[in-house]
Amino acid sequence: MTKATRDLAEALDDSLKLRDAVIETLEYGKTVRYGEEQITLVKADHILGAAQVLVEDAGGIRVAYSGDFRIDDTPVVECDVLVVEATYGSPSCRRSFDVDVRELLVTMIEKRLRGGAVYVFGYHGKLQEIMQLLRNADVSVPFVMPQRVYEVTKVCEQHGMQLGCLSLSTDMDGRELLGGNLPCVAFYHMNSRGYVGLNNARICVSGWEFNSPCRQIGDREYLVALSDHSDFDGLIEYVKRSRAKKVITDNYRVSHGAVLAKEIRKRLGVSAVAMPRTPGQTTL
């Protein structure tokens, strides 16, 4: 894993002991030898620290694991065998929008800041991506967040993200900003959506929206289709560019692995199988 991944994992679960001597972190592009194999991490455009893994054996066979990625800014690893994510592996999972969703999101937040605090709900990693988007767009209002989101955000800053003024929602500054409905952006995990900021402008970000880049889901609440995963077309394109002769689709986290394998065989004529055969758990 990368150092950033290790640090994020520890921030999310302090029971993990990832700084033990047996745990080795790697930099992107640095190859290490393990027995007769060589292992290299390749950057993936997903969240901070995300990486693809390339393993080369003594015979020159290249096996790659894509991890989670967005294809636009992820270098494709050419390989003989590819293990590819399948979060949006169904042909129904396509985002063919004619607008820049990131620009749309920034504009929506800027407009709603005129009315006070804006609440943004999403998942760890994606929340920090939105923070960086706003800072890059010169949105300078304070960012307010609960403890866990704050800890993840501080890790992101340690690894190069520049996120400006941050306040804990439980500190005096945070309480004054939220309690007084002053201009700020409050970042909360999606699990908090049911009970936080109910009387304010609210924006939820999710990759599971394919019909519209933005739609209203409540009186002052909107869903924005911002994803940190490739859609179906992006997954197919990655497989095509990888020139893999054999593909294994990840069928553990979501149930689209088998569908994606079938579509790879049909569209690309490449041998593909979903593993495990029975899906594991479903994640958002």
What are these regions (language model features)?
Residues 1-121, 125, 136-137:
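His/Asp/Glu-rich metal-coordinating catalytic cores
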Residues 2, 85, 146, 206, ...:
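Conserved residues at the C-terminal ends of beta-strands
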Residues 18-22, 34-37, 163-166, 180-181, ...:
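A short helix-to-beta-strand connector/capping loop
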Residues 22-24, 63-70, 162-169, 183-188, ...:
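Short gly/ser/thr-rich secondary-structure transition/capping motifs
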Residues 29, 76-78, 90-178, 246-284:
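Binuclear metal-ion centers of metallo-dependent hydrolases, dominated by the metallo-beta-lactamase
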Residues 40, 54, 64, 117-121, ...:
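Conserved beta-strand elements of the Class I
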Residues 50, 72-73, 127-131, 193, ...:
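Short, well-ordered alpha-helical microsegments
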Residues 169-284:
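C-terminal regulatory/interaction regions
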